[in-house]
Each structure stands twice: as structure tokens, then as C-alpha cells.
Amino acid sequence: MTAGVGPDLATASGAAGVRGWSPQRMWSVAGAVVLVACVWGFYAWDGAQTTAVLGGTVRAATLLVLGAMCGMIGERSGIVNIGIEGQFLMSAFTAFTVASMSGSLFLGVVAGVSTGLAMGWMLAAMSVGLRTDQIIAGTVLNIAALGLTSFFYDRGRSLGQPKYQSIELGPLADLPVVGTALFNRPPLTYLALVLVVVLHVLLLRSVWGMRTTAIGEHPGAAATVGIDVIRLRYWNVTLAGGLAGLGGAYLALESVGTFTRAMSGGRGFLALAVMIFGRRTPLGAYAAALFFGFTTALQGQFQLNDTFDIPAQFVGMLPFVVTIIVVAAAGLFGRMRDPAALGQPYEVR
């Protein structure tokens, strides 16, 4: 009799655990299952195209997650950053320019990251120091970056060398379906993945992460226990700009291999959607970035193959339409609470 109760209890416990899931978690799991099933189905139908789509997914997701991490550090600190688009664009320009003039991709990356840090500091100076409206401050960065890069853009300039090439990670690169897409990538892609894991641990497990959360939720209370709110917000927003700068360098030197006007193409705003859908956590943002990257890669594959005879304008809208649907669904099935002090300037008393 007792032996027969065990499986029933286990089944009941498992069912209760599933029933305890939030709607958003259930939809996320269901979406992941459907996505994996679609990938395997496509692979069985056409392995070469599936590998190309998965490679494009990782390539697009890398830029998005770098922008999302930039945004989440700022928002966890209480600062809204809609200037990621401008940080991407300006950093891509300086990275490409320095790399083409010096002949060194590494110096190009350093220039891109430095530009991101400088723009992060400017955002901090306007939002934290001058207590300017944070939306306006981010908009200023976007407009300035677009204007400056368009003015100084040299159509005839080329990189003068191959962009960053892929590095195989031994036998892992030979795995079916995911081997080439995940384990045969250029170096900045691997660096971005390492940063995702490191930042996730730091934000959720370190003293710095707890202090960052504190100044984004209750800056006044944080100040009473000795946290310098102004200084930490300055540091966080500036360092977050470095992540966007790395994203710009990645875009110019690894993903595309050149610079063109307005080449960020709205990806900074997509990164904000990725951050929201990933619930302001790096691992969650990377999962969301893979989803959005998949739609971007699918869009590119449709345009290359012209499989379904869909007008190019409608295909180009795909990532942004998916963004609207996903963000709306996230709000419908369990809206995430913003940090209590998000967007509010802090004054020392």
C-alpha cells in the first residue's frame, strides 16, 4: 500500500509545481520547446540553411545582449538609457576608423570601448550630475552620434584587412546542428558570452550588485547606510557604456567588417526590448537576445532565398513586429516591476 502511494505523491507534487509557475514562465518554456522543435524540423529539411540561420542568430544576439547589459546596469542603478543606439553607432565608427588607420583590430576594439565609456560618462554627467531628464539625455546622444558619424563618414575608407575570423573550439565545433553556430565563432562573440556569465554573477551575488540594486530602488535609504549614490551611479553608467562600446566594435570589426551611415539600424532600441523581456538579468537577456536574433536571421534568410515571395519591406519589418508582440505579451502575462527610483534624479541632502 505504501509503495503505491509514492508515485502518486510524486505525480501530485510535480503537477503542483507546474501549477505554481507564473504565466510568463509557462509561456517562456512553451516558446523554448516550440523553437527547439522548429530548429530540429528545419535541420531535418535543410541542414545547410538551418546552420546558416543559427549562425546568424548568434551573430545578431551578441550585439543585442551587449546593449541589453548596458541598459540593465543603468536601469538597476535608477538611470534610463535610451542612448544605446547612439553608443553603438559612435563606437562602431571610431573602432572602424582606428582599425583602418592603424592596421590593428585590437586597437580598433580599444577605441570602440573607450568611445562607449566616454559616452557613458556624458550620459551620467547629464542624468546624474546635471539631473537632466534622462529620456532627453539619451535622445541627445542618439542625435549627436548620427550627426557626427554622418559628417565624418568617408565612403572610400576600407578596413584594409580581414575582419575578425572564427576560432574553432576543438571537437565541440563538430557537433551536429549547434557545433558551427556556437563553437566556431570569432573572439568577440566568446568574450560577450563570458561577460554575460560574469555580469550575471556580479549583479545577483556580489556586494556591488546589491548596492546597485539599492540605489535603483531606494537611493535615500542606501545613502543612510553609507553608499555614495551619486558616485556609484556615475561609475555604473560609465562602465555600462563600455559594454555598448564593445557592441559597436563588434558590429564594425566582427559582424559586418566595415562602417556605413546609421549602420546600427535600430538595434539599440531592440536591445532595450531584450533587456525588458529578459527581466533585467544577463542570462535572461541572452535567452531573449537569441530569440530576437533568430527572427533577424530568419529575415535575412528569407531575403536571400526569396522562398515565399514576400515583399522585402515586409520581411525587413519582421524583427520589429516580433518586438512589439513579445513586449506586449510580456506585459499581458506578468509585467515586471521597474526599479522604484528608475528615472528619478537623486539630490544629496
Task: Map each language-model feature to its residues.
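Short, non-helical or kinked segments that cap or interrupt transmembrane helices
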Residues: 73-94, 128-141, 211, 235, ...
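Single transmembrane alpha-helix segments in multi-pass membrane proteins
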Residues: 52-109, 117-135, 276-280, 329
